[in-house]
UniProtKB/Swiss-Prot annotation:
Transit peptide, residue positions per record: 1-60
Cofactors demanded by this protein: [2Fe-2S] cluster
Lineage summary: Eukaryota, Viridiplantae, Streptophyta, Embryophyta, Tracheophyta
Originating species: Pisum sativum
Keywords: 2Fe-2S, Chloroplast, Iron, Iron-sulfur, Membrane, Metal-binding, Plastid, Plastid inner membrane, Protein transport, Transit peptide, Transmembrane, Transmembrane helix, Transport
Protein name: Protein TIC 55, chloroplastic
Subcellular location: Plastid, Chloroplast inner membrane
Stromal side: 61-492, 540-553
Membrane topology annotation: Multi-pass membrane protein
Any one Gene Ontology BP term: protein transport
CDD domains: Rieske_RO_Alpha_Tic55
PROSITE patterns per record: RIESKE (PS51296)
Signal peptide per UniProt: none
A molecular function GO annotation: chlorophyllide a oxygenase activity
Length: 553
């Protein structure tokens, strides 16, 4: 998501402390291979997959001008290496960490349905969120204690959550208050209750505490000072994505890809602007890292990035106008893990001053443009996710992280080395822990059949699309956004009305005898047809994926 739009938060700006980003020694020449790609050369099969990324290939000088094989000294100039003396010595720092003792971003508060439960996930934990009779948020484990049916497939009756399988009803702290099949004189078993999770509303986002052993630590709920500033306004969107949250975070903290992958998607992305970037790490802790970045040729680093455990990324900037007033810009990314190969993202772009031109566009227009941005990266990131699972090695064996583009990515994977032992699974820079259960069964991702079979009453469908499908824009975003859902319904109503008017006007034009009346009626029908087309286009913009059109440059 165009990090060029993000900005620096004065609350988060630490005193600049320089950390030297040391680099690892180059691979020995024995592991380096060079060949003309046009030849029939194949890698030595004895070369393990984890070392293949060290095989360097360059084309013959006759084929590619100025092609050179990087030697060890040149490697040290461009590749990210050890970031501490401890890492240089091969020693690994490990921090205490328990993934359940964290607050995870669940949903934008304004988008939680009032009339239906909402099924969500944190890693492999299924939870259900709903508003009770007092409009308070409740969060339960998403399975009925009776026969394990998903409570998110149920309905709300008088503020109670009813399982639609047998009608058991639950309220408050997960207590069962009704079992239709019990005899009149029988008491409801005490064990007929559901597990609950603590939820809190903070700055327009609902957060869930996943530990059921440790009391919620409210001080861990992230607070974003820019969003509390007077006059600060933001555009917020939610997206489900078909790749792991760690891949998502990598992508979001990678400003170098924006000019290429998102070329001309908005004014800030142009492929001719792709260039070396400068990074300065100012903070490394067990909770994350922070630092400055900017274009190397400018010699300045005006953007401040902070990653905070478990899945919060913000990119901030301050711009002083000609009157000396500071305008605060923020790009906030809340990335919730929703299982292997899946994630949910809340994006919030905001500023204390916004261009008046923004008011000329409806909010759904910015939302569909955000969907387009994610679709431009979706194929790359999904395949990257698959390769990580297949190779089963740390990222340092697979990635070639450049100092001038990938510093944040390397920092993130090194942070995972510290804390990954306390996660359900992780892929760190030097360490990995694989999931206990595979993410796929035969050709289908785990949970796919149940997902496609679900009626998902809280989410609904459109046209012939009724089953959740993360490859489709409608199910990745629209079902999670009241604004876009309402816009599509309105466009559909107007389309139907205008279509009926077109037919009626055309019929009248045939029946009337006066030439002037015929012209007037046909002209009106034509205008209504334009309206039908506009409505169809708006619906398509919210429900149809972006298709990249290649062009010769």
């Amino acid at each position: 998501m165009a990090l060029a739009l993000a900005s620096a938060n004065s609350f988060l700006l630490p005193t600049k402390t320089h950390f030297a980003l040391h680099v690892s020694p180059p691979p020995s020449k024995k592991t380096l291979l060079c060949t003309n790609p046009s030849s029939n050369f194949s890698f030595n099969k004895a070369l393990s997959s984890r070392r293949r990324k060290q095989a360097w290939c360059v084309a013959a000088a006759a084929d590619v001008k100025d092609a050179t094989l990087l030697d060890g000294e040149e490697d040290q100039k461009v590749l990210v290496g050890p970031s501490s003396e401890q890492e240089r010595k091969g020693e690994r720092e490990v921090a205490d960490y328990d993934w359940t003792e964290e607050w995870y971003p669940l949903y934008l508060t304004k988008n939680v349905p009032h009339d239906a439960p909402l099924g969500l996930k944190v890693y492999d934990k299924n939870i259900v969120l709903f508003r009770d009779g007092n409009d308070q948020f409740q969060c339960y484990e998403d399975r009925c204690p009776h026969r394990l049916a998903k409570l998110s497939e149920g309905q709300l009756i008088d503020g109670r959550l009813e399982c639609l399988y047998h009608g058991w009803q639950f309220e408050g702290e997960g207590k069962c208050v009704k079992i239709p099949q019990l005899p009149a004189d029988a008491k409801i078993p005490k064990s007929a209750c559901v597990k609950t999770y603590e939820v809190r509303d903070s700055q327009g986002v609902l957060w869930v505490w996943m530990s059921r052993k440790t009391p919620p630590n409210v001080s861990k709920i992230p607070w974003f000072e820019n969003f509390a500033r007077p006059g600060f306004q933001d555009i917020s969107t939610t997206h489900e994505l078909p790749y792991d949250h760690s891949i998502l975070l990598e992508n979001l903290m990678d400003p170098a890809h924006v000019p290429i992958s998102h070329d001309r998607t908005d004014w800030s992305a142009k492929r001719e602007d792709a260039q070396a970037l400068g990074f300065e790490v100012t903070e490394r802790t067990d909770r994350g890292f922070a630092g400055w970045w900017g274009r190397e040729k400018d010699g300045s680093k005006p953007n401040f990035l902070r990653f905070e455990a478990p899945c919060v990324l913000q990119n901030n900037r301050e711009i002083v106008d000609k009157n000396g007033e500071i305008n605060h810009f923020s790009g906030l990314f809340l990335c919730r893990p929703t299982g292997q190969g899946k994630s949910m993202l809340i994006v919030r772009f905001g500023a204390t001053k916004r261009s008046p031109l923004i008011k000329l566009f409806p909010e759904w227009y910015f939302h569909q443009n955000a969907s387009k941005v994610f679709e431009q990266d979706m194929g790359f990131l999904s395949s990257q996710n698959e390769i990580l699972l297949k190779e089963k090695v740390p990222t340092k064996e697979l990635y070639l992280n450049l100092k001038s583009s990938d510093t944040w990515v390397a920092e993130y994977r090194k942070w995972m080395d510290k804390v990954g032992h306390g996660m359900p699974y992780h892929f760190g820079h030097s360490t990995i822990s694989l999931p206990e259960e595979p993410a796929v069964v035969e050709h289908a991702p785990a949970g796919l059949v149940a997902g496609l079979s679900a009626s998902s009453p809280a989410k609904g469908g459109i046209g012939t699309m009724h089953a959740p499908n993360l490859a489709n824009r409608y199910f990745r975003h629209v079902i999670h956004c009241k604004g876009c859902s309402s816009a599509i319904k309105a466009f559909q109503i107007w389309k139907n009305v205008l279509s009926g008017v077109v037919v009626a006007l055309a019929a009248l034009a045939i029946l009337v005898s006066g030439r002037q009346w015929k012209v007037l009626l046909l002209a009106s029908a034509s205008l209504c047809s334009v309206g039908v087309y506009a409505c169809s286009t708006a619906i398509a913009m919210n429900t149809t994926n972006f298709i990249r059109v290649h062009r010769r440059l």
